[in-house]
Amino acid sequence: MRTIIIPTLCILYITMGLSAFGTNPKTKNPTFENWNDFKSQSQQSKYISQILKSHSNKDLEDKKLRVVYFYPADRKPIKDHRKRWNGIMTDIQNFFRTEMNRLGYNQVTISLEKENGILKLHEVQGIHKDANYTYKSGGKIKGEVFKALRAKGINSEEETLLIVCGLSKTDGKKVTIYSPYYGMGANHNKGICFTADMEWLSIAGLKPDPKKIILQVKEHRGFEPFTLNRFNTVYIGGTIHELGHGLSLPHNLATKKEATKGTALMGAGNYTYRKEWRQGKGSFLTHSSALRLL
């Protein structure tokens, strides 16, 4: 996984609860002379929420994030992929909800497709064998995914796609990763980003590990030791960070005041995701990132 700066930085989509975006004819826009009139972030968010309410004449379409699971022609999806990714995406959804609520924007979060009560994965089997896919295969995989979704009546040019790639190999505690792991741009209509799937990847792996498991992980260099906790923080954190790019969020840094909470998600927050569940400070959403998601 590498940090990639996305060139297209337009607002895409994140679903807001109807109570927050619904029409409210009694809402009046407060007046002010200067943005600096607001003495706190909470005052800013209250004002912005009132503006959004007053300009909403109809409920917004509940447009959902499409999660695609891609795997090669000569392989099957990685073990327990549906169960693990249901847990991962539910936690990511909860992260956005909690952070947006903390910033004063009610229950704003990503909207996920569900099937039989769990996350719906659009499974796409590639046309090439495993050996033909690498970290640089994003464009190739994108084309195959777009074609497969088109056959299902989905126009990928108007969707936000998180493509989870089953491009890794696990041999006991040795993990080799060769999946695309980056965003490929976003605007108000669409976005696309890639992440990797591995057998050891799960929400349980973010919580204290009494067994003190050490993995040997190879991605861009040789094998490196990772605790199970660090492995899941880095790669689930990488998933939500790249999804941020898919939702048009640029890289940013926390203000001095914000930094007391931990690390900005769209800064180096992919390396601190859910560390607060164990020891230390985790990742958080900056107010500037939140504003792009409204």
Briefly describe each language-model feature range.
Residues 29-185:
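Propeptide-to-catalytic entry region of secreted or membrane-anchored zinc metalloproteases
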Residues 1-27:
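Bacterial Sec-dependent N-terminal signal peptides
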Residues 183-220:
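A structural motif
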Residues 234-250:
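Active-site recognition of the HExxH zinc-binding catalytic motif
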Residues 63, 189-191, 261-262:
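Residues that flank catalytic or metal-binding motifs in active/ligand-binding sites
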Residues 92, 246, 266:
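An active-site-proximal "capping" alpha-helix that borders the catalytic cofactor pocket
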Residues 218-239:
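Short pre-active-site segment immediately N-terminal to the catalytic Zn-binding motif
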